[in-house]
Each structure stands twice: as C-alpha cells, then as structure tokens.
C-alpha cells in the first residue's frame, strides 16, 4: 500500500481516500490502500541493507528525506530496484525519482540515488484478475557498488512449497519504511522514516497472491501498513529471495496483507526483461 503523508492519516480521511492526499503530482491508485511495517524493529545499517525507500520531492523544497517517501522496494540487480506499479503509475514519464538505502530517512546527510528512469508492467490497471502490480526503477551503474542484491524465486516456487505442506506454518519477513499502527482502539499511524522488519504468519496462497496474517493481537507477530508498498516479502528461512511484494491490505492494517507473487508466469515475463531469472 502506498504512503500517505503521516500528518494526514486521520481515520476518516483514510477510509474516504487512502492515497489521495498527495497533491504534487496527483495519483490515486487503482488498488489504493497504503501499507507500513508495524510490530517490528529497526533493521539498522547492516540488516536488510538492500531494501530501500522510493522517494520523490513532493514538497518541492529540494531536500530529499523522510517527508518524501512514496514506497519501499528492493535491489534485485546493481541497476534495478523493484517496487509496485501503483507506486509510480501516476508520475509523469520524466519524473525524477530517488532511492535511498539509509536505515533512517531523517538522519542527517543521508545518501540518495537519483534514478535514471522507471517503468511498470503495461498490464497494470487492465486486468482485475491479475493486477500486474510491478515496477522497476533504474539506477546508475556504479551507484550501488558493493551492495548485495536479492534473488528472485524460481518459477512456481510457492506452489511447490504449498504442495509439500511447507507453507502452512511458514513465517515471512516484512521489511519497509512505512508507518506503524495502533493495535486496538482508534487507528493511529506513527511514522518516523526508519526501516523496520517484522514477521507475519502465512494465511493463504492464490494464483497471483500471497496472503499473510498481520493481526498482532491474535498472532503476537507483526505486519505492514502505509508506506510499505512495493517492499519485499522473504521467507524467514531464506532472507535473500524476494518471493512477493506488498500490494495492499485492510485499511487499518490489523488483519491481512496481500502481496503480489514473483514466481508466476506474469511476474517472470515482466521481470525477465530487466534481470536474469533463476
């Protein structure tokens, strides 16, 4: 789910127009509920270091920091940053996007990388059965020198695990820069620009979706919320392979998260244009 300015995350506004408070540029998403890590811990500089924030100078002040976070994503090659289509489809083609892998977007003097371009799956927004919710941000060749890149899954990876009964008790890492949320009472969404990780339990596997539980009260674990869209999902048994990316969830971030699978023919057809597939 895409980020909305945290100061505007009052419950009424959230339910009425989850992603509509950005004004420069405008970009209501077709799937619209935004998403962020909650029930988690800061990753620090070394853990999940190749998970980054997608940024745009929304306030046009020339300073790129936590106020400019749009979504989360992950580095899948030295020059390719993977995120969600609904994070970028509203931008003009010449929009200057940025990526930062800083663990705290409000830290002084964070490094930001000016993207050289971006594109998203042309099927996005045209197929309600399969959202094609993928985008890639292109980075300069030497900008990520020395950084590790994440792997993509083999074809049918999650199906194979399901067939073996290996998913029912599986847990997954959520990693992102999004907001937290209050577990009970009136919804609240604190945001601090810090990259965090949490763990969620498996819920269901669909042809294009991985669903995870994020009911903290019931499971004692965490989830994601506003600002985590495009962020990676890893099996806790393999934190190097991005098996899905965040697309959406319930508006108050207390039930389930719905994540777009990367092991399907649709995902592989798009991503295979930009990176070598396993």
Give the positions of each predicted feature.
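Bacterial N-terminal signal peptides that target proteins for export
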Residues: 1-8
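C-terminal motif of bacterial Sec signal peptides marking the signal peptidase cleavage site
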Residues: 15-18
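C-terminal subregion of chymotrypsin/trypsin-like serine protease catalytic domains
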Residues: 20-36, 44, 70-89, 95-101, ...
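Chymotrypsin/trypsin-fold serine protease catalytic domain
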Residues: 25, 130-221, 257-258, 264-272
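Conserved catalytic-core segment of clan PA serine endopeptidases
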Residues: 33-46, 65, 93-161
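A conserved glycine-rich beta-strand in the N-terminal activation segment of trypsin-fold
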Residues: 51-53, 59-78
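Generic short beta-strand segments
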Residues: 53-59, 176-180, 248
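Solvent-exposed loop/turn segments at secondary-structure junctions
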Residues: 80-81, 87-89, 125, 142-145, ...
């Amino acid at each position: 789910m895409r980020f909305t300015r945290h100061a505007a995350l009052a419950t009424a506004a959230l339910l009425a127009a989850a992603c509509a408070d950005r004004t420069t540029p405008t970009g209501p998403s077709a799937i619209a509920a935004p998403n962020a890590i909650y029930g988690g811990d800061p990753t620090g500089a070394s853990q999940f270091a190749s998970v980054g924030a997608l940024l745009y100078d929304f306030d046009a002040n020339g300073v790129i920091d936590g106020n400019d976070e749009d979504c989360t994503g992950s580095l899948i090659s030295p020059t390719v940053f993977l995120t969600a289509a609904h994070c970028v489809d509203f931008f003009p083609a010449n929009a200057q996007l940025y990526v930062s892998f800083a663990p705290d977007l409000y830290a002084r003097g964070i490094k930001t990388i000016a993207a050289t371009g971006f594109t998203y799956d042309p099927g996005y927004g045209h197929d309600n059965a399969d959202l094609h919710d993928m985008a890639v941000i292109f980075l300069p060749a030497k900008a990520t020198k020395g950084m590790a890149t994440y792997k993509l899954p083999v074809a049918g990876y999650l199906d194979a695990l399901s067939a073996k009964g290996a998913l029912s008790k599986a847990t997954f890492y959520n990693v992102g820069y999004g907001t937290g949320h209050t577990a009970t009472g009136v919804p609240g969404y604190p945001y601090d620009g810090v990259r965090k990780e949490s763990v969620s339990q498996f819920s269901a596997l669909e042809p294009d979706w991985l669903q995870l539980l994020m009911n903290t009260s019931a499971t004692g674990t965490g989830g994601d919320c506003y600002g985590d869209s495009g962020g990676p999902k890893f099996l806790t048994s393999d934190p190097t392979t991005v098996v899905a990316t965040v697309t959406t969830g319930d508006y108050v971030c207390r039930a389930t998260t719905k994540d777009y699978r990367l092991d399907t023919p649709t995902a592989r057809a798009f991503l295979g244009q930009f990176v070598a597939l396993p």
